[in-house]
């Protein structure tokens, strides 16, 4: 009887390990956006839910910012400089990213989309 219990216990442990191994680990995704002439390029980023996303933004002319309200992200990019940051895309949906600088109308029109595909 003890051997049978041990055997069943080992089978259950192996089955649990198999289930854990089959779960997908979050992917690491990297993007480089160029900010130039009040535009982001690319202006659309697509990731999977729970991905760890690394974003580098390069300014080719002026100072810019990058904001995604739903993820509480706000970063500044100096003229001709870069900024890099990471976040976990833990919410599925489509989210607007934009420059939140208010010194002129051109910044207000600078935007793009982050698409987070659900699991």
Regions found by a protein language model. Give the residues of each.
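Hydrophobic h-region of N-terminal signal peptides that target proteins for export
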Residues: 12-21
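Bacterial N-terminal signal peptides that target proteins for export
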Residues: 1-9
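Beta-strand-rich interaction surfaces with strong enrichment in secreted/lumenal proteins
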Residues: 43-45, 72-76, 86
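Extracellular/periplasmic metallocenter environments
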Residues: 22-27, 77-119
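Short proline/glycine-enriched turn/loop motifs at strand-loop junctions of beta-rich domains
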Residues: 59-63
